[in-house]
Amino acid sequence: MNRKTTLRLLSMILILAFVLTGCSQPAPTPAPAPPAAPAPTTAPAPTAAPAPTAAPAAPAPTTAPAPTAAPAGAPASKYNDAPILAEQVKAGKLPPVGERLPQNPLVLYAPEIGQYGGVWHRGFLGPSDRNGLIRVVNDGLVRFSIDGASVEMKYAESVTPNATFTEWTIKLRKGSKWSDGQPFTADDIMFWYNDVVNNKDLMPSVPSWLLNKDGSKVKVEKVDDLSVKFTFGAAMTLFLPEIAQKDAGDKNYPMFLPAHYLKQFHASYANKADLDKLVADAKLKTWTELFYLRQDQFDNPDLPVMSAWMATNRYSEQIFTMRRNPYYVGVDKAGNQLPYMDEVQFKFFADAAALNLAAIAGELDEQERQISLANYPVLKEEEAKSGKYKIYLWSSTGGDEAGIIFNLTYKKDPELTAMWTQLDFRKAVSYAINRPEIQQSVFLGTGEPRMGIIKKGSPWYPGDEWAYKYTEFKPDEANALLDGLGYTKRDSEGYRLLPSGKRVGFELSAVPALGAYVDVAQLAVADLKKVGIWVDLQIRERDLHFQMREANDLQAEVWNQDSAGTMFSGSTKFDIRMPIYGNLTYGPLFKTWYDTGGKDGVEPPAPWKQIVTLQDEAKSAAPDRQAQIAQEIFKLWVDNLYDIGTVGLTAADQGVAVVNVKLHNVPESLTKDWALRTPGNGKPETWFFVK
């Protein structure tokens, strides 16, 4: 196989991995909401929201999926910088822009050449909402494209495989600098790998993507000051999408760190007495706690960063402000250093409802996170009336907006766990849910009742049978299944009883933010009551929900499935070995079993073991085999109802974008998902305000 053919194969892999939103399957036509189904908020819902705008399909590349090097920028003498930075240069506080940029800057193309200045006003719900900050900075060596169909260079100048995809070499841009002006080099990647990943105090277990099939560690070595080589025991065809989900904004998944700054907080480098004093002064117990605190760019404004904007204060404050990085590596095609906007300000709101009111009033310049689809009619009305903003609907790669997931390793009540580990019980729950009602009431008629798999048109799509399996509203079938399990006795309120006399039921945890989790949960609870299943709906804040998830304390949860298009890379929700924080609560102790080599935790059932085996095979598989593997996993997933999907293919989960009419270059069509770090894949450093 020659080099060109090999790279074509890699391109195909990426196209398979990220479903193009312009697939042949059109979005379902929204049906009008029935009068009897009230909107989940007090806002009127006179019309159904249109389906999300599909992003155009990207043609398959003829060579590599992303350019091995970015196009050359303007000559150094022709670079321009923002007026506020030019003033600092004039005052002798900053070097000229040509000296701050790398020799070969990242060149970003957008519909318009922008204007400098302005503050991007956004909202957030405080520290528990930090993923919204991570998405904006999208602080990685590479990143996903606007349509999610490919991976593009960012801080890296090139990422190159060998002919067998067992070696990948990352080359950085010569002359790149951290926000404090210090060089950004291969040593910053090596510090992350040698001193964080391989330090058991900081990271007890090595991330699975850095392990070979036999459990040995992937070899990571410095080639020169700008290059680092990763060597795998077998072909690693998913390296690009994997590292696209490793960004320094996410303290759990960085891939580079400012060694020159963080060494003072690391036990391998710092003087012990000095480090002990720093720990004591911070009122912490260990150096590892201090290290993680100082590594967090949203909680430590002194941390040097590579992102377009850098923190000026802590994100626990009422207004969290990020200011332009004078050393950012990007320019536009005219040689203007990016970003265009001077600042990003995140205003704290006590809840999502208050944030939505601010968006409706036109107080936020671009906001998709926490925006409720239920408010779409009001937003459209205000869009026409005030003329302050435009509303875009961004699409996803598939999945579902709010599924019900049972914890199959819950320990506190074995009788309850035994009940919901029965597949027939989960089938009964699924058949009892009236998805068409949820579609109309919660999602304004958009999307479709479905399971959380990839959307039609992808080579990974296993077929309609699995997209819609168990999604029919069949309360009679649900009752028959429950009767067949022996739950025939009922109490005075009509709830079925277990042999012990306890009610057949479970506690369901839902977070009142991001998507429509609570609205969906409330309707599902009412449906399940009709077949005799008692549900204790607990509405919890995100931090507490996640703490309980990690502690194996959740019985069941409502969450979305947003990794259908990136099943084999990043913190995919289709692999129980992923960190529990970012995964779903199928069985936290299954992960423990894998982490300890079977010495602790709970041994997974055969289907889960099969999924794990398939996941491992996919990392080195050819494109056609990857498609087969994806289909096999989706089938196992649905057949066993590990995630009971409700409705998918809507803009509900961070796809309703409110955009100031004066803010230009914001993509009207954008593929959104957590893996893509939306809106970060929309290149926000190119967005600008028209004066």
Residue ranges of each PLM-predicted region?
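N-terminal lobe/hinge region of extracytoplasmic solute-binding protein
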Residues: 87-90, 95-163, 194
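Aromatic- and charge-enriched surface segment that lines or borders ligand/interaction sites
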Residues: 157-203, 229-231, 355-358, 419-421, ...
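Ligand-site clamp/hinge motif
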Residues: 173, 296-300, 327-379, 522-526, ...
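Surface-exposed binding/hinge segments that line
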Residues: 208-290, 666
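A structural "hinge/loop" feature
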Residues: 111-136, 144, 155, 239-248, ...
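Detector for C-terminal structural segments
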Residues: 18, 124, 303, 309-320, ...
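Ser/Thr-rich, Proline-interspersed low-complexity disordered segments
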Residues: 23-76
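Extracellular/periplasmic solute-recognition and catalytic clefts
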Residues: 200-206, 220-221, 310-323, 347-414, ...
